[in-house]
């Protein structure tokens, strides 16, 4: 089975370079959630499931803020970041305007590598994606890459209420099913509630969202005897694997360190669900 993060026993390290990006546009999609487009050469290297570090301009704030890549434009000259304001750094980002410059670090992490995934797993006929909350944006680029490969996915996205940010974007690339906590749109409940109301029979599950959701996805995949790939989100410091601040427990020992650990920022953020303890 295709395993993320390791090829021939060696961890894959993404190319990393600090660069200056230019703000192309920014808008608020929902309360506290912003849609930011950045012009950057790093877009040429970006893929589904990866992320960049965005540096605040405040000199007192040294560390970049990790933000998942939502989308890469067609000519690979710009990155789309959809993020939630969660602290001083992201609050500063929400004030960016067209023409502003910002320092970024990337491209970071190991993502889905769609072409390799599909080549190694021809049995993945019904590909299903699951996004919850701010875990929704990273699934858009994955949907886009799957559709480009001729494998339009079934996409299950979960919201708190009727603020369905990015729903229309997902509809360009796959069949979309919505779940809302308050029942205002679609299925009342979560993404798995929505799945069980359809005739969709997944051959693989791919997810990003709250930890409770990821645990449920892992359990559902286990019961169906199919693989699940989950994108883990964790507080990060360096973003390049040096500080060990984003380690997760694994079910297997690392061949080199001989410990049951993996760094989310380098070996992840995408993991085969059965290989991590969550």
Give the role of each language-model region.
Residues 211, 234-269:
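Local cysteine-cluster metal-coordination motifs and their immediate loop/turn environment
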Residues 14-98:
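Ferredoxin-reductase
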Residues 25, 71, 178-180, 230, ...:
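Structural signal for conserved beta-strand scaffold positions within catalytic alpha/beta enzyme cores
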Residues 88-235:
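FNR/FR-type flavoprotein reductase catalytic core
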Residues 1-12:
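N-terminal amphipathic/basic-hydrophobic helices that include classical n-h-c signal peptides
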């Amino acid at each position: 089975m295709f395993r993320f993060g390791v090829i021939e026993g060696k961890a894959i390290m993404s190319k990393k370079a600090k660069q200056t990006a230019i703000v192309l546009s920014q808008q608020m999609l929902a309360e506290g959630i912003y849609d930011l487009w950045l012009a950057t050469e790093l877009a040429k290297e970006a893929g589904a499931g990866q992320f960049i570090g965005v540096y605040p301009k405040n000199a007192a704030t040294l560390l970049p803020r990790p933000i998942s890549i939502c989308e890469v434009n067609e000519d690979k000259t710009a990155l789309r970041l959809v993020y939630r304001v969660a602290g001083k750094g992201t609050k500063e980002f929400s004030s960016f305007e067209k023409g502003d410059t910002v320092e970024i670090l990337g491209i970071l992490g190991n993502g889905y590598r769609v072409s390799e995934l599909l080549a190694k797993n021809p049995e993945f006929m019904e590909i299903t994606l699951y996004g919850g909350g701010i875990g929704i944006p990273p699934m858009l680029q994955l949907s886009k890459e799957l559709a480009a490969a001729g494998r339009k996915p079934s996409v299950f996205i979960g919201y708190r209420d009727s603020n369905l940010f990015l729903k229309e974007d997902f509809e360009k690339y796959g069949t979309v099913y919505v779940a809302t906590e308050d029942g205002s749109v679609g299925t009342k409940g979560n993404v798995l509630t929505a799945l069980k109301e359809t005739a969709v029979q997944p051959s693989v599950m791919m997810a990003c969202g709250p930890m409770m959701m990821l645990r449920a996805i892992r359990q559902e995949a286990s019961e169906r005897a199919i693989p699940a790939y989950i994108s883990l989100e964790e507080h990060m410091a360096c973003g390049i694997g040096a500080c060990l601040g984003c380690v997760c427990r694994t079910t297997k020992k690392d061949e080199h360190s001989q410990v049951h650990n993996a760094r989310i920022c380098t070996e992840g953020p995408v993991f085969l669900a059965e290989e991590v303890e969550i």
